[in-house]
């Protein structure tokens, strides 16, 4: 997998209360990923970008909410979320892996 596709697959970390609890307790991390990305692509992208071993990848599609505005109804974009479980003994550090 080339470096350009790695950055198109992983859009960024998803920060929430649940994601923070999973990262602290179970060594699982949550990412926003491209909607056309497969589990194998996500696994390879995380392993190459952060130099860790991935145990499991679980994905889900999040449907965009319908919102009311002054101009009528609007819809937020659909997006895909990936839960990344690392092998025991592995840890993901966002600060040093970006270098």
Curated annotation (Swiss-Prot):
Recorded GO MF terms: rRNA binding; structural constituent of ribosome
Subunit structure: Part of the 50S ribosomal subunit. Contacts protein L29, and trigger factor when it is bound to the ribosome.
Database matches in SUPFAM superfamilies: Ribosomal proteins S24e, L23 and L15e
Cellular component annotations (GO), alphabetically ordered: ribonucleoprotein complex; ribosome
Protein name stated in the entry: Large ribosomal subunit protein uL23
NCBIfam families, sorted: PRK05738.1-3, PRK05738.2-4
Function: One of the early assembly proteins it binds 23S rRNA. One of the proteins that surrounds the polypeptide exit tunnel on the outside of the ribosome. Forms the main docking site for trigger factor binding to the ribosome.
InterPro entries attached to this UniProt entry: Nucleotide-bd_a/b_plait_sf, Ribosomal_uL23-like, Ribosomal_uL23/eL15/eS24_sf
Protein family according to the UniProt entry: Belongs to the universal ribosomal protein uL23 family.
Keywords: Ribonucleoprotein, Ribosomal protein, RNA-binding, rRNA-binding
UniProt keyword annotation of RNA-binding present: yes
GO biological process, one term: translation
PANTHER family linked: 60S RIBOSOMAL PROTEIN L23A
Coiled-coil residue spans: none
């Amino acid at each position: 997998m080339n470096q350009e596709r790695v950055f198109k697959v992983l859009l960024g970390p998803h920060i929430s209360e649940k994601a923070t609890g999973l990262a602290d307790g179970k060594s699982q991390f949550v990412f926003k990923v491209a909607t056309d990305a497969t589990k194998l692509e996500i696994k390879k992208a995380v392993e190459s970008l952060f130099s860790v071993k991935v145990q499991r990848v679980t994905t889900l599609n999040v449907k965009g909410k319908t919102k009311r505005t002054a101009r009528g109804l609007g819809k937020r974009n659909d997006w895909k979320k990936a839960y990344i479980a690392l092998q025991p003994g592995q840890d993901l550090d966002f600060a040093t892996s970006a270098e």
